[in-house]
């Protein structure tokens, strides 16, 4: 893995967050390079700029390297992106006082004169981001969006036109392109919230746009709900909670328990919190954390059950480091005798990791694609 970023005279040292990861993953990609290269070649003045979907700070560090006083609004939905960007600014002796931080639900300032953006995997989320920009950007504002060349087509350019303004793509460089969109100055309304029922559990669920499983139970959650553990649980963590459906169901089954919802996505945590209220569950029993696994979970929280459906993607990268960290955090934070109860794709072989960490692992249920595993802290 290289940590040395070099584009058009800008030299940086950049690491992913957390830093202890596979050696084949780096903290930026060619789309970051292309976008920063385009900015430098345009000799852009240091105007108020939004940087959106900057994975670990390559863009904000690069722009700050060009001009440490360049006013930047950095928007991210991922806690790991926020933490990684902070660390990489420190690693390169770059100030943070030129940065304002925003989540994907915050209202952006109206003085923006430029937007630099990476194309996210989730196009519904992307449409939401463009719509939010349409509500604050004056006509004529440029939005530069970098992506893999294979991701750019006529349908994507139509998304720009429908939600923000006309767009065109650059020539390819390192298999990436930069789309230039010009705001038409017409504010669009945000999409209406979609709520859907899970009748077998008497639950009503809604998701914000960057939350997995838009309008139905995903298969992994369904098999998990069918195989929740039995016991006398008082403190439960829904780790990587998404819309919170697992934690909501455990609140029904164990009404005396405190349920702690944790996710790297701010939209996921907000969705879980809204769903808790929507289903009229006790306000004092639900606790919500936008966090990198259990890194900042209060020390007094000692769960006797952790539920987990680990992701194996971080942005565009396929990686098992998130699952490893979730399992390690569970082992560290569980009470003696506490249970880690997970669902995963069979091919990911999580049983090997759990056996290594906990010295025990039981297969609770399985089908052709998924397996439910349980390990106990002893």
Curated annotation (Swiss-Prot):
It catalyses: guanosine(1835) in 23S rRNA + S-adenosyl-L-methionine = N(2)-methylguanosine(1835) in 23S rRNA + S-adenosyl-L-homocysteine + H(+). GO terms for molecular function: 23S rRNA (guanine(1835)-N(2))-methyltransferase activity; nucleic acid binding. Its EC number is 2.1.1.174. Belongs to the methyltransferase superfamily. RlmG family. InterPro entries: DNA_methylase_N6_adenine_CS (IPR002052), rRNA_m2G-MeTrfase_RlmG (IPR017237), RsmC/RlmG (IPR046977), SAM-dependent_MTases_sf (IPR029063), Small_mtfrase_dom (IPR007848). One of its GO terms (cellular component) is cytoplasm. It is found in: Cytoplasm. Keywords: Cytoplasm, Methyltransferase, rRNA processing, S-adenosyl-L-methionine, Transferase. Specifically methylates the guanine in position 1835 (m2G1835) of 23S rRNA. This is Ribosomal RNA large subunit methyltransferase G. Coiled coil: none annotated. The gene is rlmG. It comes from Shewanella baltica (strain OS185). It holds the Pfam family MTS.
């Amino acid at each position: 893995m290289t940590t040395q970023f070099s584009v058009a005279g800008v030299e940086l040292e950049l690491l992913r967050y957390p830093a202890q990861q596979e050696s084949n993953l780096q903290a930026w990609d060619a789309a970051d390079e292309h976008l920063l290269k385009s900015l430098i070649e345009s000799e852009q003045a240091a105007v108020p700029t939004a940087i959106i979907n900057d994975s670990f700070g390559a863009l904000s560090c690069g722009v700050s390297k060009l001009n440490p006083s360049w006013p930047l609004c950095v928007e991210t939905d991922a806690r790991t992106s926020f933490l990684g960007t902070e660390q990489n600014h420190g690693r390169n002796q770059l100030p943070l006082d030129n940065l304002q931080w925003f989540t994907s639900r915050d209202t952006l300032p109206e003085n923006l004169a430029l937007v630099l953006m990476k194309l996210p995997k989730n196009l519904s989320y992307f449409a939401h981001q463009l719509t939010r920009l349409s509500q604050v950007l004056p006509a004529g504002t440029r939005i530069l969006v970098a992506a893999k060349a294979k991701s750019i087509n006529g349908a994507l350019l139509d998304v720009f036109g429908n939600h923000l303004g006309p767009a065109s793509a650059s020539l390819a460089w390192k298999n990436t392109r930069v789309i230039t969109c010009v705001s038409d100055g017409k504010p669009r309304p945000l999409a209406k919230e979609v709520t859907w029922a899970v009748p077998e559990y008497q639950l009503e669920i809604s998701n914000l746009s960057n939350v997995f499983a838009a309008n139905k139970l995903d298969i992994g959650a369904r098999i998990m709900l069918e195989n929740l553990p039995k016991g006398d649980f008082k403190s439960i963590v829904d780790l990587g909670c998404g819309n919170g459906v697992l934690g909501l169901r455990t609140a029904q089954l164990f009404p005396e328990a405190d349920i702690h919802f944790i996710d790297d996505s701010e939209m996921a945590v907000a969705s879980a919190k809204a769903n808790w209220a929507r289903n009229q569950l006790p306000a004092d029993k639900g606790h919500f954390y936008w966090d990198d696994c259990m890194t900042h979970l209060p020390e007094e929280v000692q769960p006797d059950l952790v539920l987990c459906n680990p992701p194996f993607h971080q942005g565009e990268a396929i990686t098992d480091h998130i699952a490893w960290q979730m399992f390690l955090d569970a082992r560290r934070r569980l009470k003696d005798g506490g249970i880690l109860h997970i669902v995963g794709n069979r091919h990911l072989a999580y049983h090997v990791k759990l056996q290594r960490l906990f010295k025990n692992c039981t297969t609770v249920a399985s089908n052709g694609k998924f397996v439910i595993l349980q390990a106990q802290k002893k």
